[in-house]
């Protein structure tokens, strides 16, 4: 397609800023269990394969899960800008941090919800949400569109917004694909086929946004 896509699999390195959810048979801290860094990376690598298969040029902020691969957020946005990406994805999953358990996708872009810093960020974020919510393998506790500006979502940050988006000049946003502390979803996110579905929906969103030829084969979930 000639497109240039930059993928940032969020977090990295099984470190203190990572997110570990202990579910049987994995103990807390077991790197074979659920860690957001691993899950994000798997999705990113599969998305890269899908996009490159369609002729896109793809750069990633990391391709391994080591401490040294967890780049500074300013470095990530600078790399995406210098790469002259047509689209930037920061891939994450979410958590409530409380005893409340919910599960739905959420898209965050720079600016106010009704006044994005870059209007195209919101356009493509809405497209991705539409595709992610099509996933019927999981259970969504709500299906209404959740696409919000980070200045509204973090009102106490004085319009600082998310670090990875702060200095981003190319079109892009951060996605929270689902809630990894919703235990059924935790188990699903340990399954490579399930993570592939999310990557597939990212690729579909790219195809729709850029109005490029779609895939010639489907994916049966």
Tell what function each PLM region has.
Residues 120-158:
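Active-site-adjacent substrate-binding region
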Residues 1-79, 83, 103, 108-111, ...:
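Active-site histidine-acidic residue metal-binding/catalytic motifs
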Residues 90, 94-98, 144-220:
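Active-site-adjacent mobile loop/cap segments within catalytic or ligand-binding domains
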Residues 36-39, 43, 47, 60, ...:
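Stable alpha-helical elements in mature extracytoplasmic
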Residues 1, 52-53, 80-84, 98-101, ...:
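Extracellular/periplasmic catalytic domains that process cell-envelope and extracellular macromolecules
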């Amino acid at each position: 397609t000639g497109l240039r896509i930059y993928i940032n699999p969020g977090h990295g390195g099984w470190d203190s800023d990572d997110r570990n959810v202990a579910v049987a048979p994995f103990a807390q801290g077991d790197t074979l269990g659920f860690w957001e860094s691993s899950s994000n990376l798997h999705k990113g690598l599969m998305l890269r394969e899908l996009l490159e298969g369609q002729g896109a040029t793809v750069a990633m902020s990391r391709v391994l899960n080591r401490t040294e691969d967890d780049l500074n957020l300013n470095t990530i946005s600078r790399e995406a800008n210098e790469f002259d990406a047509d689209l930037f994805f920061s891939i994450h999953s979410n958590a409530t941090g409380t005893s409340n358990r919910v599960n739905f996708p959420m898209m965050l872009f720079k600016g106010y919800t009704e006044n994005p810093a870059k209007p195209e960020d919101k356009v493509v974020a809405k497209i991705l949400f539409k595709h992610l919510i099509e996933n019927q393998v999981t259970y969504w506790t709500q299906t209404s569109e959740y696409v919000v500006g980070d200045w509204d979502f973090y009102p106490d940050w004085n319009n600082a917004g998310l670090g990875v988006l702060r200095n981003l000049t190319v079109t892009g946003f951060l996605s929270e694909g689902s809630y990894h502390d919703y235990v059924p979803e935790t188990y699903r996110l340990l399954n490579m086929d399930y993570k592939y579905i999310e990557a597939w929906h990212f690729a579909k969103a790219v195809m729709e946004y850029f109005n490029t030829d779609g895939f010639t084969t489907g994916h049966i979930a």
